[in-house]
Amino acid sequence: DEPLETCCAYANACGAFAVSRLLCSPEIPTFPELQFFLANGSPHHALRQDQAINHVHWATTRPASPPGIMALAIDHRIQLEAVAREVGAPFERISDFKVLAVQAAARVADGRQGFGMFIDGRYGREALFRAADHKLWVARPVELTGSRPLDFEYGGSLGTHLIEWPTAQVIKCLCFYHPDDPEELRLRQERELARVYDACRTLGRDLLIEIIAGKHGPLLDDTIPRVIQRIYDIGIKPDWWKLEPQKSATAWEAINESVARNDSYCRGVMVLGLEAPFADLVESFRACAGVPVVKGFAVGRTIHIDPARAWLAGKISDAEAVDQMAERFASLVSAWTDARRAKAA
């Protein structure tokens, strides 16, 4: 239905993409990508080097994802080691407990889309398999737990290790980053974030960047928006963000504006828990319920740390641990859905 001149422009542009990207038909541009190129052009003769266009290609060809995620996070390592040490349990039992957490999450999900888990590979290998059996959305950490400056679980090439991970697993990277950190620290952390971003894009994997700023400086209305803008400014566009609860609507509005302005294809923001009491989490859900870019939550220790302590100490059974975690997770799911429903009313 297009004029001949437009059809020729489409054909020539598609040919230029296919030749530049070397893989022919798999690299033909999507229609949004084609429109972006024809509207904006490119400063690169080799179109494969244009990161803005490459991002549109990635975002319009990546696998579909649920529009929102409610996740039980059990990727904690040093925290559960501390609990095991406290009650005199061997670290090996942490792996068994994480399998119980999958059972709890699967019970609450009950086969529905939009439920997920954060699970590590160190203690959660079997749990990762079980989560896949239940078709839960899964994010898996790549960072060395607790590291600041950011470091990774694996030495050498990140890509060499990440290529072994199932493609359905979202690669999650936690960075303790405050915009007022010393410049040397900030630049080092940014280099590491760029490494994992490059590895994810090269391998075709979703990347979730988790930012925790409040542990290393004041959490003001502009703190997280400044971090987000800086990460976008250095060319990193994660598929997901995971952020700590904000103290004001102003902060959430600034976060929403920054993400929307810099990456309209971002899948969204997930709110983390930081072991907050249940009532505090409910309030944090209400605070961000009407923010368009916020798409879910990921809460861990509020759900599992007390059952973990009791189970590792031999005070409760497997079934009791699953029941307790499922009850807490279900309560948070209800709080989240109620907050969203109330805001939409």
PLM-predicted stretches and their roles:
Residues 1-36:
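Conserved post-catalytic alpha-helical subdomain immediately downstream of the catalytic base
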Residues 116-120, 169-176, 181-189, 220, ...:
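Catalytic beta/alpha-barrel core
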Residues 123-129, 179-199, 245-261, 278-281, ...:
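Active-site-adjacent beta->alpha loops and helix N-cap segments on the catalytic face
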Residues 135-138, 203-207, 217, 262-277:
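Short beta-strand/loop segments at the ligand-binding rim of alpha/beta enzyme cores
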